[in-house]
UniProtKB/Swiss-Prot annotation:
Keywords: Cytoplasm, DNA damage, DNA recombination, DNA repair, DNA-binding, Endonuclease, Hydrolase, Magnesium, Metal-binding, Nuclease. CDD domains: RuvC. The RuvA-RuvB-RuvC complex processes Holliday junction (HJ) DNA during genetic recombination and DNA repair. Endonuclease that resolves HJ intermediates. Cleaves cruciform DNA by making single-stranded nicks across the HJ at symmetrical positions within the homologous arms, yielding a 5'-phosphate and a 3'-hydroxyl group; requires a central core of homology in the junction. The consensus cleavage sequence is 5'-(A/T)TT(C/G)-3'. Cleavage occurs on the 3'-side of the TT dinucleotide at the point of strand exchange. Its main location: cytoplasm. The gene is ruvC. GO terms for cellular component: cytoplasm; Holliday junction resolvase complex. PANTHER family: CROSSOVER JUNCTION ENDODEOXYRIBONUCLEASE RUVC. Mg(2+) 1 binds at residues 7, 138. This is Crossover junction endodeoxyribonuclease RuvC.
């Protein structure tokens, strides 16, 4: 399984790719799509093009993205929503199922507490993936999203397996 995590942003969109094999997580790639265009349509196209390029290079089988969170600034929320929508649409166009996780869920899965600081997320991502240095914040967040997705999908598989067993016992 190859998982693509996306940390959407209107100025920087982070991405992280991990591979899971034999219940072990391996680092594949991470980075940031730097948004340099001025107009909103061109900025959104730049996000879509960047994600498409990542999909073409790394061929993920699953994708995950951070849910939108509360913003003090309404315009900031709108811009983030646009970036997130373009990212989700690009993933869907490329036939990837998209799972969504809150910042609290992601931090809980990676650090063990939903109130973790960004530096703690970076440190744990570095440790879990055996990286020689801490990844940049946006890339670390995207890798954390991918790791959270793996842990969540593993838990869901156990739960669905348990329900099949219990259904057999009832019959």
């Amino acid at each position: 399984m190859v998982i693509l995590g996306i940390d959407p942003g209107s100025r920087i969109t982070g991405f992280g790719v991990i591979k899971v094999q034999d219940n072990k997580i391996y680092y594949v790639a991470s980075g940031c799509i730097q948004i340099t265009e001025i107009t909103t349509p061109k900025r959104l196209k730049q996000i879509a093009d960047g994600i498409t390029q990542i999909i073409n290079i790394y061929a993920p089988t699953e994708a995950a993205i951070e849910q939108i969170f509360m913003f003090q600034n309404p315009m900031g929320a709108i811009k983030l929503g646009q970036a997130r929508g373009v990212a989700m649409c690009t993933l869907a166009i490329n036939n990837l199922e998209v799972s969504e996780y809150s910042a609290k869920q992601i931090k809980q899965a990676v650090v063990g507490t939903g109130g973790a600081a960004k530096s703690q997320v970076q440190h744990m991502v570095q440790s879990l993936l055996g990286l020689s240095k801490k990844p940049p914040e946006d890339a670390a967040d995207a890798l954390a999203i991918a790791i959270c997705h793996y842990h969540s999908s593993k838990s869901l598989a156990k739960i669905s397996g348990a329900s099949r067993v219990s259904q057999k016992r009832i019959k």
